[in-house]
Amino acid sequence: MITSIVDSIHQIPVAEWERLARPAGLYLSHRWLAGEEQDPTATSAYCLVRDLDGTLLAAAPLYLVRDEPNDSYQPETVLPPRLRPRVIAGARRGYHNTPLVGPGQDACLTRLRDAARRFADRHGTTHWWPYLTTRAATALAPLYPDPPLHLGDDAFIPLPGTGIDDYIASLPARRRAGIRRERADFAAAGVRVRHQPLADCFEEAGALLAGHQRDHGHDRDGVDAMTALLERQAAAMGDEARVVAAHDAGRMIAFCLYYHYGATTWIRAVALDRGHPAPHLYFNLMYYLPVEDAYAHGTTALHAGMTTVEAKRRRGADVSALYALADRHPGAQVTGGVLDTPPPADRQSPA
């Protein structure tokens, strides 16, 4: 096998990358990663493992982070004090991460780890994998010095059958009645629902998203920052960046940004005017309207992400844990919670 690192996703053919990425999810797709390269807060690279014939067997993005604006991706926020890696391995956004490994190629995981170590070491730091799926964390854990750290939970809502009525019918009777009431009350409120590309509405959506972030204590995420983020995402993702929005009196009062990718519809962002009286605005924009479009597009699950997990369970979500795995500087080990040296033999820097 041959391991290499390239500087841009554009150096890797789309079809070759997508063969590994499509089962893994949106936030490791070729197009998404191309957009992430425009983010000025980090420098990207890509570790590739090929066989001697040149077939891509495994891969992982690597990010040398200079300024992390998202608290949930800051090591000082989510990792123990002794761990301060500045290189992210895998997806940097989306709270859903896994190494890209072809079927039967788990032996390549060691090569991905070794390449990430060398890349980080060149920059005087270490690497970590944030928000790994349970399956990915289980596969990678034997290669790292510390056990996986639980960061949160991930929610996928299965979409059985061929339409939203089939989804509702799959839920317990009490929940079926509640969802039908929430949809009916929202429809009776008379707000206008529009489906459109993000490129057509990123300014309105950016203003709503900034307000949502401010309500959740993220003061640095102002209107200019959120509008620029959505504009960059619209430019990178094109018509794949879909918005369903509620309007009243000519004004956007709520929106949901989502993507259909693989067999899943991925919710990326939801924001609303909390002062608007339309009933069940959040539930309709977060769940029911995207579910309708998911069925129209033929996907079979809705990725609802982290937070408010119990509300997602009540709407049929399957919930699984998300983990972090972090490397240590060569020569370090933990004794009684303190970094010491020398390392055991199997923790030496890889050849």
Annotate each predicted stretch with a short phrase:
Residues 1-4, 14, 49-57, 64, ...:
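Solvent-exposed, well-ordered amphipathic alpha-helical segments
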Residues 2-77, 126-278:
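A conserved beta-strand-loop-helix scaffold within acyl/acetyltransferase catalytic domains
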Residues 44, 85-92, 166-176, 195-199, ...:
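Noncatalytic linker/hinge segments flanking ATPase motor cores
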Residues 59-63, 93-109, 173-192, 244-247, ...:
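A broadly tuned preference for mixed-charge, low-complexity surface segments
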Residues 64, 141-171, 248, 297-351:
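Active-site/acyl-donor-binding loops of N-acyltransferases
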